[in-house]
Amino acid sequence: MQGGGQRGFRAVDTDPSDVFDAHLAASQGVEPGVDLVVWPEDVVDVEGPVGGTDEGEALARVATATGATLVVGVIEGAGRDRFRNAAVAWGPDGRIVDRFEKVHRVPFGEYVPGRAVFDAVADLSAVPRDAIPGTGPGMLRTPAADVGVLVSYEVFFADRARGGVRAGGRLLLVPTNAASYSTSQVPTQQVATARLRAIETGRDLVQAAPTGYSAVIDHRGRLRDRSALGERAVLHTTVTLRDGRTLYVRAGDAPVVAAALAAVAGAWAPARRRPGRGRRATR
């Protein structure tokens, strides 16, 4: 699901209700009979838990109207200075069935390390609040399937995808948001990285972004569908739910680390055995 709109604007300069309304409108294009609808990251902005808000009620209606599981990227304010960045799932009956809160936050984007120090020497108005980090693997257990979740920036961390699959994820979802970037560089980088995550884990992957790129990638990393930047789009596709585990899911980075250590040891050992040049023994 991609609501579309202008790109190159900071979140603090964007009206959250406009973004939300755009995705509500786009949801009218969902075809009957779908099992799962995925909205992007940060397209709903509320104070406190989303379930008791007007936006939450509207999302429940979308889920019941489509008869599908609905996964939405939600920003929940937690007081004046903090917030949660969550992927929340509604079942076809309109009830919240699960949620995952983003673990890997973007430094100087979602929080400011050492805020008290930087606040004295810099303007931090573009990052007025700090995200509260989540815990555990990215996983949502839903009526449609158990799905691994990588919220935006987390797609760049292979261990997050591995953790979601090891926890039972049969499909990977990447709700993301690159609307603040005016060029195609970051959206392109995100899709390329998502393709790598799909190959590593052997899972089909669905990425949703408010202004692109939204994409569908198969378990071999092949790009099956992709939106254009800035457009309103609904990508309809069929994905395969998978259960097997690739070598990377089973072993993680251990084989690569072992190979690197072996290469270093192999290069070092001959140097240790090589006799010194230009030396002669005397008695």
Q: Residue ranges of each PLM-predicted region?
A:
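Enzyme catalytic cores with a strong preference for nitrogen-chemistry domains
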Residues: 1-283
